[in-house]
Amino acid sequence: PVRDGRYGPDERYPMVLQSLLGPGWAVAEEGLPGRTAVFDDPITEGMNGLRLINPILMSHAPLDTVTIMLGTNDCKARFACDSYQIAQGIARLTKKALQTECWRDNAHPDVLVIVPPVITPAYDRLIFREEMGPGCHERCAGIAARLAPMLQGLPGVRFLDANTLPGAVCSPVDGMHMTKEAHRALAQGLYRELTASV
């Protein structure tokens, strides 16, 4: 987190990943602060990933792999959902990505679903406590265990819990955004995952 905006492109994990992968790969970044997996935000317009994923993917087609890391913003108290319902939303979004006609040479889809780092319990004493509302840590902490079985057996879907990657943690500044070091740790984990079968 930075107080006057976002990290620069070369500091965020997609472009760090690009630097690790090298010139044989092209990473397209589509991050948006506040985006949800499936919820329309009554306060901030245009945040529903389910409504946007088709045109986003088609704008970058043809694609070999799609990565999805959402869920943090779905934990906001105003959506009144628990971890199971948030996981259901991510699973629904994943299925829509699989069905989008964006894949190179009509190849089999390859979607890597990433569970984001868990919001720390201290977030409710920090700068986003009013924006997020109560109970976010608990909801966020439960996503991985509920999402994994929902995705198991889906052809073309891989699962990665960022919380299993050393250093991929939320910042003590706000308890919910990653530090530069965490972005690099996540990029390194994604590099290992994406190149393991190459």
Where are the predicted features?
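Serine-esterase "nucleophile elbow" of acetyl-processing enzymes
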Residues: 1-32, 38-43, 55-58, 66, ...
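Alpha-helical cap/lid subdomain in secreted, periplasmic
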Residues: 23, 47-198
